[in-house]
């Protein structure tokens, strides 16, 4: 399945900051250390030189990825018409059949974070939630079988969007 190109404004800004940091701070530091290591002589057994070149390739790879990805991403901002329904950027409180309650936020695939309960728009749960309202029921196929969830609450964190 192809990754979606949606991202929150805060997520786009975080990726942009990472790109700027890598380009303006990290890469120059590593380039300087590689130059210093190269000046020491034999490069074939120079661990600092070899490690520095490897790190420089990793940084360049990440810079290329971020540059292309940021161009392709589409920032999705909250719109008042979304109130009451689940759309991109929504926080949702779900309850399962056992009465367990969890809260999730639907974000882009570049910013999903299980430790924050941020789920990707491309995930089966998020796809089932899109367009639903409070008190709706969704059914999702999980590795252990079908799971049913009830939507208790929907809200948008409009303060962190800008």
From Swiss-Prot:
<dbReference type="GO" id="GO:0006354">
    <property type="term" value="P:DNA-templated transcription elongation"/>
</dbReference>
<dbReference type="Pfam" id="PF03449">
    <property type="entry name" value="GreA_GreB_N"/>
</dbReference>
<dbReference type="InterPro" id="IPR036953">
    <property type="entry name" value="GreA/GreB_C_sf"/>
</dbReference>
<dbReference type="InterPro" id="IPR022691">
    <property type="entry name" value="Tscrpt_elong_fac_GreA/B_N"/>
</dbReference>
<keyword id="KW-0175">Coiled coil</keyword>
<keyword id="KW-0804">Transcription</keyword>
<dbReference type="GO" id="GO:0003677">
    <property type="term" value="F:DNA binding"/>
</dbReference>
<dbReference type="InterPro" id="IPR023459">
    <property type="entry name" value="Tscrpt_elong_fac_GreA/B_fam"/>
</dbReference>
<feature type="coiled-coil region">
    <location>
        <begin position="52"/>
        <end position="76"/>
    </location>
</feature>
<dbReference type="InterPro" id="IPR018151">
    <property type="entry name" value="TF_GreA/GreB_CS"/>
</dbReference>
<dbReference type="GO" id="GO:0032784">
    <property type="term" value="P:regulation of DNA-templated transcription elongation"/>
</dbReference>
<dbReference type="InterPro" id="IPR006358">
    <property type="entry name" value="Tscrpt_elong_fac_GreB"/>
</dbReference>
<protein>
    <recommendedName>
        <fullName>Transcription elongation factor GreB</fullName>
    </recommendedName>
</protein>
<keyword id="KW-0805">Transcription regulation</keyword>
<keyword id="KW-0238">DNA-binding</keyword>
<dbReference type="GO" id="GO:0070063">
    <property type="term" value="F:RNA polymerase binding"/>
</dbReference>
<comment type="function">
    <text>Necessary for efficient RNA polymerase transcription elongation past template-encoded arresting sites. The arresting sites in DNA have the property of trapping a certain fraction of elongating RNA polymerases that pass through, resulting in locked ternary complexes. Cleavage of the nascent transcript by cleavage factors such as GreA or GreB allows the resumption of elongation from the new 3'terminus. GreB releases sequences of up to 9 nucleotides in length.</text>
</comment>
<dbReference type="InterPro" id="IPR036805">
    <property type="entry name" value="Tscrpt_elong_fac_GreA/B_N_sf"/>
</dbReference>
<dbReference type="InterPro" id="IPR001437">
    <property type="entry name" value="Tscrpt_elong_fac_GreA/B_C"/>
</dbReference>
<comment type="similarity">
    <text>Belongs to the GreA/GreB family. GreB subfamily.</text>
</comment>
<dbReference type="Pfam" id="PF01272">
    <property type="entry name" value="GreA_GreB"/>
</dbReference>
<dbReference type="InterPro" id="IPR028624">
    <property type="entry name" value="Tscrpt_elong_fac_GreA/B"/>
</dbReference>
């Amino acid at each position: 399945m192809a990754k979606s190109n949606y991202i929150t404004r805060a997520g786009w800004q975080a990726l942009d900051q990472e790109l700027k940091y890598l380009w303006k701070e990290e890469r120059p530091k590593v380039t300087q250390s590689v130059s210093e290591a190269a000046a020491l002589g034999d490069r074939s057994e120079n661990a600092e030189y070899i490690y520095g070149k490897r790190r420089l390739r990793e940084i360049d790879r990440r810079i290329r990825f971020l540059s292309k990805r940021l161009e392709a991403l589409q920032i999705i901002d909250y719109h008042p018409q979304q109130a009451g329904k689940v759309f991109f950027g929504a926080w949702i409180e779900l309850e399962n059949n056992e009465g367990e309650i969890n809260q999730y936020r639907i974000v882009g695939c570049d910013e999903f974070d299980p430790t924050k309960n941020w789920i990707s728009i491309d995930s089966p749960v998020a796809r089932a939630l899109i367009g639903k309202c409070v008190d709706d029921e969704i059914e999702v196929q999980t590795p252990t079988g079908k799971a049913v969830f009830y939507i208790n609450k929907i809200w948008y964190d409009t303060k962190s969007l800008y």
